[in-house]
Design a protein with these regions (language model features):
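Short alpha-helical donor nucleotide-sugar binding micro-motif in glycosyltransferases
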Residues: 330-335
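Conserved acidic donor-binding segment of nucleotide-sugar-dependent glycosyltransferases
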Residues: 374, 378-385, 394-399
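A conserved catalytic-core segment of Leloir-type glycosyltransferases
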Residues: 2-21, 48-128, 297-314
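Conserved donor-binding/catalytic core segment of Leloir-type glycosyltransferases
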Residues: 225-246, 252-255, 268-270
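Nucleotide-activated donor-binding/catalytic signature segment of Leloir-type glycosyltransferases, i.e.
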Residues: 277-326
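Aromatic "clamp/platform" in nucleotide-sugar-dependent glycosyltransferases that forms part
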Residues: 343
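Short hydrophobic beta-strand element within catalytic cores of glycosyltransferases
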Residues: 356-364
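A charged, aromatic-enriched C-terminal amphipathic alpha-helix characteristic of glycosyltransferases
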Residues: 400-437, 443-446
Length: 466
């Protein structure tokens, strides 16, 4: 008798054979195209999808000196550098000449995507997933939807538009965007903001590269603390724009309060070029804190350590050199607290990177959905420096709790890799594709097994015919 068994492994409606991805964004992976977290998101998400085996096309405002089209990752990832003829007159990055680029983007991109990617893929029986990022792509996404409608192809494409922040929300035609795309965002905090606008976006979190889960060299961690001559004191770190929203004043005021307690403390501060930095450092001096600039033109770990050692006498070290990811991870791991808090944070990637390094993240209480107070970090609810002070005193008095928090932080970060984010995205795309009836449900795979008794009978029967 034949035994029938159904396979219960997870079955995907969206597969690498039946789906093509298109990502539309102003920012991208070129240094010319990077202006913030959006370019990093687009680069990491597209690479994660391509690594999974999906064909991926990325359209962005690329470096005018690089090829207009570049094929990567074994042909699975294609970079399309758009508006290069305009960018050559605007050498200062992606947002230099933004309005001119935006006009050309809206006029030329939708037709190209529909004619050269979407329509051919749909003709082959494939689903097309088109993902737009930030306000600059809203008009283009709506036009893509309209062009697909005109060709009778709209139900074979899933269009998601994602809000990473609230920048230029006033420039978006929300009625049209909501009709032509499925709106998404990166955290429940952003979802709640958009609820107030009559929108109900899907939440698809950001991620971090899986490589950031690798352990940080403890020898480098010890070396950093030795360079700071901290002698059992408290190291705080903050990496953010010089922006009032990032609560820099709270950071320097917490250092002053720790000093008043008789605790030795140092703040490693890496800001940007914004003028608010002058105000923050002036406030630090008013509080009686010493400030030093750490500078180096060399780009290696030894020079970074040396630069910090030269400033170790200061209470606040203003880091004036670029911090590559490998050195950032050492700072995150070596610090007693990484102040990743702000008054408005759509997601909070610094807090998650800190967790991945085994650091102690002090996040805000806005978009950092991954943070659980006293479990994998600390969640600051106010702008009062006494809150930071209190948590640091707690960690000093209960060092075992700090160790537990660091361990849980690493476990949490493992759930927020770009691979996990891509998997989440695919699940949401599948749901929408089913609503559009763009996916045909397949029956579970059936496997037949032959029992030993049946096999013996079959062999006997075969032998009798020989």
């Amino acid at each position: 008798m034949l035994a029938r068994r159904e396979e219960h492994t997870k079955t995907r409606g969206i597969t690498t054979e039946n789906t093509v991805f298109v990502i539309v964004s102003f920012e991208g992976k070129d240094p010319y195209s990077l202006a913030g977290g959006l370019g990093v998101r687009v680069a990491n998400l597209s690479e994660a999808l391509a690594d999974m085996g999906f064909p991926v096309h990325v359209f962005f405002i690329g470096d005018p000196k690089l090829p207009g089209e570049e094929v990567c990752q074994g042909g699975r990832l294609v970079l399309h550098r758009w508006c290069q003829w305009i960018s050559q007159y605007h050498p200062n990055g992606v947002y230099d000449g933004e309005e001119s680029k935006l006009r050309d983007f809206n006029q030329s991109l939708p037709t190209y995507i529909v004619e050269h990617i979407a329509a051919p893929a749909i003709a082959q029986g494939k689903l097309v997933a088109i993902l737009g990022e930030e306000w600059q792509t809203t008009e283009a996404m709506s036009r893509i939807s309209d062009l697909l409608h005109q060709r009778g192809l709209r139900d074979k494409a899933v269009l998601f538009w994602n809000a990473n922040n609230i920048f230029s929300f006033n420039r978006i035609d929300w009625g049209k965007l909501n009709r032509t795309t499925t709106v998404t965002t990166v955290s429940r905090y952003m979802k709640h903001i958009m609820w107030g606008m009559g929108l109900n976006p899907l939440v698809i979190p950001n991620g971090i590269p899986k490589r950031l889960l690798q352990p940080v060299e403890e020898e480098k961690v010890r070396q950093l603390r030795q360079c700071l001559s901290i002698d059992g004191g408290t190291v705080l770190a903050k990496v953010a724009r010089w922006d009032p929203d990032k609560r820099w004043h709270m950071a320097v005021e917490s250092v002053a309060r720790l000093k008043q307690r008789g605790m030795k403390a140092v703040l490693l501060a890496r800001g940007g070029m914004e003028p608010h930095g002058v105000e923050v450092l002036s406030r630090a001096r008013e509080l009686g804190l010493s400030v030093s600039e750490a500078k180096t033109s060399d780009k290696n770990l030894d020079s970074y350590f040396h630069a910090l050692q030269n400033s170790c006498w200061a209470d606040v070290i203003d880091i004036k050199f670029h911090l590559p990811q490998d050195f950032l991870r050492i700072i995150y791991r070596a610090s007693d607290a990484v102040l990743a808090n702000s008054g408005h944070e759509p997601f909070g990637i610094v807090g998650l990177e800190t967790m991945a390094a085994g650091g102690v993240a002090f996040t805000g209480s806005t978009g950092e959905d991954y943070a659980i107070p006293y479990h994998n970090g600390f969640v600051l609810e106010t702008s009062d420096p006494r809150e930071i002070e209190g948590y640091l005193v707690y960690l000093r008095e209960c060092p075992d709790e700090g160790t537990k928090i660091r361990n849980e932080a690493k476990r949490t970060a493992a759930y927020f890799t770009w691979e996990a984010a891509a998997d989440n995205l695919i699940s949401k795309l599948e749901s929408q594709a089913r609503l559009q009836r763009a996916l045909v449900k397949r029956s579970p795979a059936v496997r037949f097994e032959i029992t030993e008794a049946t096999e013996s009978k079959l062999l006997q029967t075969a032998g009798s015919h020989n």
